[in-house]
Swiss-Prot record:
Binding partners and assembly: Monomer.
Cofactor note: Binds 2 manganese ions per subunit.
Protein name: 2,3-bisphosphoglycerate-independent phosphoglycerate mutase
Natural source organism: Coxiella burnetii (strain RSA 331 / Henzerling II)
GO molecular function annotation: manganese ion binding; phosphoglycerate mutase activity
Database matches in SUPFAM superfamilies: 2,3-Bisphosphoglycerate-independent phosphoglycerate mutase, substrate-binding domain (SSF64158), Alkaline phosphatase-like (SSF53649)
Gene: gpmI
Function description: Catalyzes the interconversion of 2-phosphoglycerate and 3-phosphoglycerate.
Binding residue positions for substrate: H129, R159, D160, R191, R197, R267, A268, D269, R270, K341
The keyword Transport is annotated on this UniProt entry: no
Length: 519
């Protein structure tokens, strides 16, 4: 399709409704059940289409649900990007995993010093932050390397998986340890504590103290017993309190001087805080009573440039992402989101680029400090909208990218009523943003990174559905008269479509396609 050759509206606003999927099912669909006059009007009167946001369309295995990291990477990248989950699984299948230099070097250090190897990771089949088969592969590698003490500190999911589903993963890895005879699960803790990303350092501290001092609310003889104890306390997997697994006459297993740690989460954002607690020489977020001097600390993927650890699978470099391409042409752009999704509209949208590009400003709106977001389903959407409306009216930017976290973050709680309220808040915010845009002659593309809020209950497990979905997501254009092509697109088509509407050809690195024609 040819480049749009008329005067291009300004600003163009890309609105990402995080966790907003499309489903014809109306029961337990918080989006369909919500009162959404603005969205109803958009779908009735403006051009719209659907996009694939899961599986191969976003560089994941067939059937694998999408997630925010992958979604933003494809929205900003404009191309299919092989994801870490796929890369690592392929390395396991080919045998390359078992020859990985970073892993082998760390394991050899532990063997030479007769020290323990501690595996940290989300023990889950979810495939969003980790996958349990990859943890099993590392246990296998450590066994074949002759490591005598292999300890798994299992972080439990219940968010990208059903709320009470950890037992199967625990039993599988326990059977593997029994077969090898040289390892065990040493501790359990819910991801609520170990994988915080919102600087709630009191949660991270509980995980760190469990790992380094054995400080635990509960003690159990086996991991299964520890999990059942958590369930008896009314906790689901995500919220399992720090639990040490050991015999009554033994001391807890902790990470000690000379030991090796391998963090097996492949997604960076929720692994950073705990990693900083181990590695940051200038760490001040809480008082570390113990800081073990480790022989090695390996991260499965790169978590951040200022985290100095060996990396088993370094990132693929992306060039000419949406942000970089616009920056090189002198366009001014703004990224705005609340804390929970700030990394996604900056780091991930920019293809893993930490620093802003020239002409790129960033605005962080703090997320509310509540235990879970069903307690405040509006989160910080109204505050962000207030800022956004003001910025639109000032006419300082060519492109504004914003993310509304509510459908995803409230959807993850499994609270259908709260999620419905969250959708209604977003609907009100969209009305204000579109009104402001139309008053200055601006335009909007509205999309999502993956599904979530459209499925709030799982009939198969008879539990609340707290995970993402593999459903399609919308793409709505609010602007000039236009028509979308008939074929379903994918998230990597968003950037080429956006560039077309801004009157720009896409760069050759972008393999996604423009989905719209201006009339």
């Amino acid at each position: 399709m040819t480049q749009a050759d008329n005067q291009n509206p300004k600003p163009m606003v890309l609105i990402i409704l995080d966790g907003f999927g499309e489903s014809d099912e109306t029961t337990h669909n918080a989006i369909k059940e919500a009162n959404t006059p603005t969205l109803d009007k958009l779908f009735r009167h403006y051009p719209h289409t659907l996009l694939e946001a899961s599986g191969r369309a976003v560089g994941l295995p067939d059937g694998q649900m999408g997630n925010s990291e992958v979604g933003h990477l494809h929205i900003g990248g404009g191309r299919k990007v092989p994801q870490d989950l796929t890369r690592i699984d392929a390395a396991i299948a080919s045998g390359e995993f078992y020859e990985n230099p970073a892993l082998i070097e760390a394991l050899e250090k532990a063997k030479a010093l007769n020290k323990a190897v501690h595996i940290l990771g989300l023990l889950s089949p979810g495939g969003v932050h980790s996958r349990d088969n990859q943890i099993a592969a590392l246990v296998e590698l450590a066994h074949h390397c002759g490591i005598k003490k292999i300890y798994l500190h299992a972080i439990l999911d219940g968010r990208d998986t059903p709320p009470k589903s950890a037992l199967l993963s625990i039993e599988k890895i326990t059977d593997q340890f029994h077969a090898y005879g040289n390892g065990k699960i040493a501790s359990l803790i819910g991801r609520y504590y170990a994988m915080d990303r919102d600087k709630r350092w009191d949660r991270t501290e509980k995980a760190y103290d469990l790992l380094t001092q054995g400080t635990a609310q509960f003690h159990a003889l086996t991991a299964k017993e520890g999990l059942m104890l958590a369930y008896e306390q009314g906790n689901t997997d995500e919220f399992v309190s720090p639990t040490s697994i050991h015999r009554h006459n033994e001391t807890p297993i902790t990470i000690e001087d000379g030991d090796v740690v391998v963090f097996m989460n492949f997604r960076a954002d929720r692994a950073r805080q705990l990693t900083y607690a181990f590695l940051d020489d200038h760490f001040t977020a809480f008082n570390r009573q113990v800081r073990p001097k480790l022989s090695a600390f390996v991260t499965l993927t790169a978590y951040a440039k200022d985290i100095h650890a060996a990396v088993a699978f370094p990132p693929l470099e992306l060039h000419n992402t949406l942000g970089e391409y616009l920056s090189a042409r002198g366009y001014r752009q703004l990224r705005i989101a609340e804390t929970e999704k700030y990394a996604h509209v900056t780091y991930f949208l920019n293809g893993g680029q930490e620093a802003p590009f020239n002409g790129e400003d960033r605005l962080l709106i703090p997320s509310p400090k509540v235990a879970t977001y069903d307690l405040q389903p509006e989160m910080s959407a109204v505050e962000m909208t207030n800022k956004l409306v003001e910025i639109i009216q000032n006419d300082d930017y060519d492109l504004i990218v914003c993310n509304f976290a509510n459908p995803d973050m409230v959807g993850h709680t499994g609270d259908e009523t709260a999620t419905r309220e969250a959708i209604q808040v977003i609907d009100d915010c969209l009305k204000r943003i579109i009104t402001a845009l139309q008053s200055v002659g601006g335009e909007a593309l509205i999309t999502a990174d993956h599904g979530n809020a459209e499925k709030m209950f799982d009939e198969k497990t008879n539990q609340p559905h707290t995970a993402h979905t593999s459903n399609l997501v919308p793409l709505i254009y609010v602007g000039r008269e236009a028509q979308f092509c008939k074929e379903v697109g994918a998230l990597d088509d968003v950037a080429p479509t956006l560039l077309y509407l801004m009157g720009l050809e896409k760069p050759r690195e972008m393999t996604g396609r423009n989905l719209i024609t201006l009339k």
